[in-house]
């Protein structure tokens, strides 16, 4: 008997997952997509398998806005293991060197300020960045080390939460593209003992925090009790990641033309920048940008 093809649901929204340790971001996405039986899905930037915490997952029309979440600032809590360096900069790598730890709390506190603000980071070899079309982690697994250009990142918070040698727990708030593994390795180098990430938990991704995150266990339990439809309660609106943007509500007349790809005028709109756009009923219909002549040009539209 031929297998009946599963008909996926055309759902739309954002689900904030508390990603479990040991699972890649894509594995987590595909698992939740299967539970929701969703037609279209995407995530908003990878978390290492070692890491846990906030991973916003976009479904349906919300995938059109995932790039803007990818660009958002992030927050983390990380356990820094001093005295040991590894090939990957975290606990999943092979041992490179082991040294005695004579670092005191004051030593660590005094080292932190140099890593706050705008700093330069050299991306790790074990990363998804590409060199001549090849992911760096694949080159690293083949034993290759290639030159990487330093990149500017911003660390807005770097605080010591606890100090229990040889481990220390740090709170980090940072711009996109920041590698906490590299931050910890560089800090270990300054301290003279080396270090790696023993644990990493993302606490914030743009406007989303741990308080909004749902565990995979919860999703599986609710799915077992009520099927895919029971999980819709965890979906947030498509524009949930853009609530810090200005909002513009169009008249019925203007919304009609705007949804057909035509820039429109709106006297109450800001003079520049990006906007969340709503129709006359307050329904989110897409994002727009103010053009040089003051009109609102549609950039990404919600399919009705």
Curated annotation (Swiss-Prot):
Signal peptide positions are none
* Alphabetically ordered keywords of this record: Isomerase, tRNA processing
Q: Which GO terms describe its biological process?
A: mRNA pseudouridine synthesis; tRNA pseudouridine synthesis
Spell out the molecular function terms from Gene Ontology: RNA binding; tRNA pseudouridine(55) synthase activity
Active site location = 48
EC number(s) given by UniProt: 5.4.99.25
Family listed? Belongs to the pseudouridine synthase TruB family. Type 1 subfamily.
In Swiss-Prot or TrEMBL terms, this protein is called tRNA pseudouridine synthase B
């Amino acid at each position: 008997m031929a297998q009946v093809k599963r008909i996926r649901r055309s759902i739309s929204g954002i689900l904030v997952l508390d990603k479990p340790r040991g699972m890649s971001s894509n594995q987590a996405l595909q698992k939740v997509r299967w539970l929701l039986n969703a037609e279209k899905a995407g995530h908003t930037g990878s978390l290492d398998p070692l890491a846990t915490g906030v991973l916003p997952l976009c479904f349906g029309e919300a995938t059109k806005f995932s790039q803007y979440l990818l660009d958002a600032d992030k927050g983390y809590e990380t356990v820094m293991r001093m005295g040991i360096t590894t090939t990957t900069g975290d606990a999943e790598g092979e041992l490179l060197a082991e040294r005695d730890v004579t670092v005191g709390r004051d030593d660590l506190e005094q080292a932190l300020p140099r890593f706050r603000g705008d700093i330069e980071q050299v991306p790790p070899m074990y990363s998804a960045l590409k060199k001549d079309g090849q992911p760096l982690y694949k080159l690293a697994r083949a034993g290759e080390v290639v030159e990487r250009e330093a990149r500017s990142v911003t660390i807005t918070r770097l605080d010591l939460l606890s100090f229990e040698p040889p481990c220390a727990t740090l709170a980090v708030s940072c711009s996109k593209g920041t590698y906490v593994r590299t931050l910890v390795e560089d800090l270990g180098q300054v301290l003279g003992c080396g270090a790696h990430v023993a644990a990493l938990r993302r606490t914030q991704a743009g406007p989303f925090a741990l308080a909004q995150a749902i565990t995979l266990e919860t999703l599986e339990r609710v799915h077992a009790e009520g099927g895919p439809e029971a999980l819709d309660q965890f979906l947030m609106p498509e524009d949930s990641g853009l609530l810090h943007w200005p909002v513009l509500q169009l008249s019925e007349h203007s919304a009609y033309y705007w949804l057909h790809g035509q820039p429109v005028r709106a006297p109450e709109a800001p003079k520049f920048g990006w906007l969340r756009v709503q129709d006359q009923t307050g329904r989110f219909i897409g994002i727009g940008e103010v053009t040089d002549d003051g009109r609102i040009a549609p950039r990404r539209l919600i399919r009705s």
